[in-house]
Amino acid sequence: MAQKPLPPSSDVLLGPVSGKSVLYLATADAPKEIDEALKKAATENKRVLLIFGANWCYDCHVLDHALHDGDAGKIVSEKFLLVHVDIGEGAKNGELISRYKIPLDKGVPAVAVLDANGKLLYSSGEGEFEAARKMMKKDLVVFLRRWQVESGTTR
């Protein structure tokens, strides 16, 4: 007797990934974008969320969609500035990959969280986001809440 497939869980990040086919612009100046985000983060009392990835990476698109949707999207828009850092085929933005301790051998997307002074607070050094399509929405929300700037505090 065949079993019925389980209904899709609303907690899984996997969702429609249409719309933005280009998240990582080939002409983007990632160091400049990070500097601009840090300046803005200081005035807006936010953190900077760096997403290392590439347009060919399905899970990068899944994570981006999740970061703009639901509770996670609300937290990101209120508490973070998002910067996409293009890795191309793996060699692009190598200095940033090293600076923010992103081990590409663990896969992408990879995430780093910076305070408004540019201090690295978190780096996904174990490939925690590599299989974004299997992450639970609630786990992403917990992650964002952990690293957001609390109201009434600075940087």
Stretch-by-stretch model annotation:
Residues N55-D59, A66, I87-K92, G118-L120, ...:
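Solvent-exposed loop/turn segments at secondary-structure junctions
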